[in-house]
Amino acid sequence: MTAISRDRLAEAAARHGLDLVGVTDAAPLPDARERMAASVEAGRMGLMGWMGGERPRVASEPRRHGPEVRSVVVVAAPYAGADRARWDARPDALRDVLAPLLESAPAEPAGRIARYALGTDYHAELRSRLEALATELRAEGLESGDVAYVDDRPLAERALAARAGIGWIGKNTNLLTHARAGSWVFLGALLTSAELEPDEPIRTTCGSCTRCLTGCPTGALVAPQTIDARRCISYLTIERPGVLDAWEAEAIDDWIFGCDVCQEVCPVNADADDSGPLLVPLLPLIEWLLPLGRREFDRAVGESALRRAGRHRLLRNAIAALGNAARDGRLGDASEARSLLERAMADTREEVRQQASTAVAFIG
């Protein structure tokens, strides 16, 4: 088998927009397994039942994905600030999808969409880059059979990235790096049968800093490196099915897809190039979503990350955020909002109808 140098691997990864790369072996990750299993056992995964069962063990043992696996190549690709252009290149990037709404309406009241979702859905884009890297490495003589993982199958990518020296896992559970991008990175991994020299882990820690723990608006970070998904805005707006109860609806504030607060307050990101989350005017967004069916919505958003939530969940979130704006006196003229919510109360989806009934009460 042909070996490949660390510099050669980094050069190849950079050609595919993968700025950070590290290598680790395929040994199990017992700490990651125990942490995942403990969260499932404590109920901190909310309604994500698929996180239980054998998943913690499979995710923490790379050779469960193939007995021939010997090494894991982990990559990180920045996505915030100037790096966002890489993910906005396709015509179905979120900014293009929502451009008419962004250009034709005042900013208030607005809903926030997390930075990671602003371009094309990273799963497909990053996987294509990883597969291109694997093809190039095979041309260098590495054995075939490489498999690309991008947060779409059970694999403890953050733990592997930390062991591969790309960064360390922060108290906010994100991977923190010394690179300009800080924690604003997507992670992916190649599992390969090649015997590659592993990198040394970074010894950096968060020290005594607790900004993410105290800065989380819902108290979802219940301990260092421990998150209760049931209180996490990202979980509530993306994964939580059904109607948001009173606490949940208020908790999301004006976030309608994801949340970035625990990264925004992190000092590691103080010098990161960052242009902020996407602000989408709520009234035109709701008006746009109301008449759409599922297939129409899927066609409209293309390969953006909004597909994960779907039309009904995004609409539910926008309605809850509109109710919060009304409650906090940020609505201004309420006539248009009331009209939209009355239409939403006749929607085909129960969660939309009920969320609208709750929100309209704040308008009076």
Regions found by a protein language model. Give the residues of each.
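Amphipathic alpha-helical scaffolding segments comprising HEAT/armadillo-like alpha-solenoid repeats
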Residues: E296-A300, R330-M345
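Iron-sulfur cluster-binding cysteine motifs and their immediate structural context
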Residues: L18, R211-S234, W255-L279, L340
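Conserved hydrophobic register position within alpha-solenoid helical repeats
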Residues: A318-A321, A356-S357
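Short coil turns that connect the paired helices of HEAT/ARM alpha-solenoid repeats
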Residues: A305-A309, R343-E351
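Non-heme iron-sulfur electron-transfer modules
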Residues: V73, G182-L191, L221-A249, N269-D298
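Auxiliary alpha/beta "docking" domains used to position bulky ligands
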Residues: M1-T205, L244, D253
